Amino acid sequence: MIIIAFSILDFKNKEAQNFDFKAGTNLIVSKGNTKGKSSLLKSMYYTLGFDVHQFPSNWNINFMYFQIEVLINNVKYNITRQKNIFRVSDVEVPLNVKEYSEWLQHKLEIKMQLANTHTKHLYEAYSSAVILPFYIDQDDSWDGGIYRNVTNTLNQYTRIPADIFKSVFNLSNYELLELQNSLTNYSKEKNTVVSTIKSLLNVLEDYRHENADVPTVSKIDKIALNKDIDRYLQMQNELNEQIVKYKMKLLNKQEMLDLQKQELSELEQLLKMNKKRYNSIETECQYCHSKLTKEQSLTRLDLSNNYFEISLLKEEIEKEVVKLTNEIIIFESQQNSIESKIDEIHRRIQNSKDLLTIDDYVKATAKKEASNELESLVDKQVLSKYNLEEKIKVLRREINKLKKEKESLREIIERDYTDLVFEIKKVLNDLNDTKLDLSELNLDELKFLEFKKISGSGMDKNKKFLAYYLIYFSLLRKYSSYIIPFCMDSFIKNEITGETAKKMFEAIEKYFFDTNQSFFSIVSENLKHLEFVDSYNKINVEGKLLVRDKYDEIALKFKFDS
């Protein structure tokens, strides 16, 4: 992404302004502080979708329209924001924050998902999370921990900002979780198929046994009995097929019911264990009577040792047990009804000795057809089992491959992180290659993807914050799955000496400014510390940020059809 231009319209005070930017380094310059630099930068990233925690006291965004022109993958878009309503140039209707966040992720070709604090379920991340790694706020980014408590929007997510950076660096485990969920589903489906095959084979064996006792019909007057044979054969065959189906359904449902009851029993034991907090309590399998530890039950049921999770699954299984029990009752009733009809046909056949031969013929033929149908069903289930096993093999290979790729990538990034810690220490401590005492600035308190509170005070603390931000900007430049223009508001929060300022600006110029677009606020007095200052685009902010004579011209940009 590249920011081309930015417009502000204050419709209450009838003031406006427009700013144009370049693709490289953009310096927001003023002669002193409180001249509007922060208002400009905060408003720009607010328009992009970052919910800024606080604006300057004299900057009331409730009476302002903001519009930013950006280039994403060589396509230009206009993004307009007023409070929590967004308009984008390629969508006709206004968007809320959630809809805009989805639009932004789609344009950046990413899929960032974060876990909700309460439900632990994954949701598509809001735009504030997408922008967070690239924006350093003047007021909220320089205290506590890096990238923490910068916006209230992110309080809904767990493990922030670590999970955001894992997603940005393609280190997130959520891809693995999706594959593992698919693997679990396929494995469960395979187990169901295996159970179905077993049930079918049992029914088939019963039919073969029954069919062996049926006498073979050798002589039948087909011409005389043709109509009766066709009629009774069709009736008998249809009813027997229905009986087979209901037997199969009953066997499958009973198998599922038994499994659900077993899982319910184990869950009840787990809940008791969880409440009593026993470390190792055995429970007994209701079928094989083997002892199951709490961990084995948790593993078999694919659960973590969480009381609420176990309780929720127990409720779901109890509902499933009731549902299966009711279905079995219905199927038994329907089967009994059909069997009554078959008995009625048998009674009619037996009433006439002339139809005895037909009765034997119908029974033998119907049982043969039922046996063939069962064999066909077994073949289909065996094929389904084979296909599922192949899918499981493929998924396991993908999971193992992805695990290795992520582990390897993390090792590479961690090595770069360690190297950057050493390099930036040298710059900020003003050390040469022969002086190896790096004790002046301690950057060893945070490992890669650790975002704990940073110790220290005064300029020492400022230097630590700056160093860690520069480390992550360097890593973003090299490993991020997407790029948003870098932004760093003023980092000088305390008195600073000339030499210290020189080293800090040297580090910024080396590790923050680069070929990608960046925005940096600076007072004109400190421009002398930048070696390549003449090559940077400067936006001078003096006096009032907004002016009346630009209002009518810029207001035309905010005319919407809808």
Swiss-Prot record:
Keyword Lyase set for record: no
Transmembrane portions of the chain: none
GO biological process, any: defense response to virus
Gene3D superfamilies: P-loop containing nucleotide triphosphate hydrolases
InterPro entries for the chain: P-loop_NTPase (IPR027417)
Gene knockout outcome: When this gene is missing the Lamassu type I system does not confer resistance to SpBeta in B.subtilis.
Keywords, in A-Z order: Antiviral defense, Hydrolase
MF (Gene Ontology): hydrolase activity
Keyword match Hydrolase: yes
Protein function: Component of antiviral defense system Lamassu type I, composed of LmuA and LmuB. Expression of Lamassu type I in B.subtilis (strain BEST7003) confers resistance to phages phi3T, SpBeta and SPR. May be an ATPase.
Protein name listed in UniProt: Lamassu protein LmuB
Source organism (scientific name): Bacillus sp. (strain NCIM 5461 / CCTCC AB 2011126 / NIO-1130)
Gene name per UniProt: lmuB
